Every structure is written in C-alpha cells, then in structure tokens.
Swiss-Prot record:
ATP binds at residues 40-47. Keywords: ATP-binding, Cell inner membrane, Cell membrane, Membrane, Nucleotide-binding, Translocase, Transport. It comes from Burkholderia thailandensis (strain ATCC 700388 / DSM 13276 / CCUG 48851 / CIP 106301 / E264). It is found in: Cell inner membrane. The gene is tauB. This is Taurine import ATP-binding protein TauB.
Length: 260
C-alpha cells in the first residue's frame, strides 16, 4: 500500500519579530487503512503539517514523499477536506462532487456515475439535484467528503472537518467517517481539537507541542479498529479504558500548554 511520509520537516516563517518556527524536525507517515490524528493546542503547526502533506507549500527543510517520490504540489492521490466545506453554491450536489473529475477531463456519464457512487457511500443518495443552500451543515460536510473521495485518492487529509458542527451531528459524522474508512481502506490524516474525537478515530495519535510544533508523543490506539471489526459505538465509549486514555491525554495536553 502507498505511504505518505514527512521526513524531518521544519517550517520557518519570516516576521517583523524575526524568524518564526511553526514546525521543527517532524517525521511521521500515513499508510493505507490507517487514521493518523494530530492533536495539540492552537498554533502548534497541525494545519501547517497538513499543508505540507497536501503539497500546498514546501517545507523550509526536510521533505515530503509518497512511496519515496517527492511531493512537489497537490495531487489526485491526496484528497483534502476542510472545516469550511468550500462548496460552490451555484452548482448542485452532484456537480460539486463531480467538479474535480470534470477538471480532469472525465466525461459527463463517467463522472456522474462516480459521483453517485461516493454520494451513496456518504449516505446522500437522493440529494444529487439539491442546491447547496437546501442542505444542512452536516450534509454539506458529507458533500465535501464525497468530493474528496470522487477521484479515488490513496489518502484523505482532513483539517478539522467536524469542528463547526453541533454535538449530535458531529457524533453522526464520526461514525460516518469510520464507516467510509472501513469501506475504502484509505489512509487518513486528520486534525482535531477534540480529545475524545482523537481517541475514537485514531489508529495512531500524534501529540504536538506548542510552537515550535514538535511531535512530543505518539500513541497507538485500537478503538477505530474495534468499530471496524463490528463493535458498537456504545460499547467502545463505555469502555473504562476509553475514559482513562481520554483523561490522560487531557492532562498531557494541559502540561504541554503550561510549559510554554
């Protein structure tokens, strides 16, 4: 399976106060059927790391690669989902999902067939012709996810995709993300501020320190795989170990913040 890697990447920005280091010597990887979650305080470089993986910007030092080949820009092998869904309101749902395929020159019938497939995957079958202003915030995020899946990327890069949703919709979306992951086997890199969400979704959890962003801890977790194997969400969240890990991570993040 393909592997997306960051090799000792650092990002330094120029500012009026001098050089500002956003990331420092960060190494990590995402492979197929993995969910790597980055967790840390605001300003710790999580979104900068995603930007490097997506090819939106180069690192100041270090390198990013897919299967050893350097990442020099965005690519169809990496689908990106943002907190702001960035949908085009003048297009209906299916045309939003198929837009990237259209830009790649895929014919109408083929791109619409693929769009319908991924809309079924995110449980939006029947909403193909709806305008964007006719659907809810959670549904808009599902359209954004479907759009990222339409080109069948090897990796999904998700920058706080659930951050703007209400609590109940967020829980539904967490379950949907795990369903999509189980169905597709994609490699996922996800950013969140929610410790509970990180514990639930991550197969590997990266804790980043406040600026400069460094990976200060890595945790292997099995709750997502337990769900994928058929265990209920209720059973997982009622597991005392889930609560223990959640509380321990909150304490760790608080210590990291206090040390700044």
């Amino acid at each position: 399976m393909a592997k997306l890697c960051a090799h000792q990447v650092s990002v330094v920005y120029a500012s009026r106060r001098g050089a500002l280091t956003a990331l420092e010597n960060v190494s990590m990887s995402v492979g197929g059927n993995e969910i790597v979650v980055a967790l840390g305080a605001s300003g710790c470089g999580k979104s900068t790391l995603l930007s490097l993986l997506a090819g939106f910007q180069p690192p100041t030092s270090g390198r990013v690669s897919v299967d050893g080949a350097p990442v020099t820009g965005p690519g169809a092998d990496r689908g990106v989902v943002f907190q702001d869904d960035a949908l085009m309101p003048w297009l209906n749902v299916i045309d939003n999902v198929a837009f990237g395929l259209r830009m790649q020159g895929v014919g109408r019938d083929a791109r619409n067939a693929r769009a319908r497939d991924v809309l079924r995957l995110v449980k939006l079958a029947g909403f193909e012709q709806h305008r964007i202003d006719e659907i809810s915030g959670g549904m808009r995020q599902r359209v954004g996810l479907a759009r990222a899946l339409a080109a069948d990327p090897s990796f999904l890069l998700m920058d706080e995709p659930l951050g703007a949703l209400d609590a109940l919709t967020r829980e539904h979306m967490q379950t949907l993300l795990l369903d999509v992951w189980r169905e597709t086997g994609k490699g996922v890199f996800l950013i969140t501020h929610s410790v509970e969400e990180a514990v639930l979704l991550a197969t590997e959890l990266l804790i980043l320190s406040p600026r400069p962003g460094r990976i200060v801890a890595r945790h292997s977790l099995d709750f997502a795989r337990r769900y994928a194997a058929g265990e209920s969400m209720r059973s997982i969240k009622s597991d005392p170990r889930f609560t223990e890990i959640h509380l321990a991570l909150v304490e760790q993040l608080m210590r990291e913040t206090e040390e700044v």
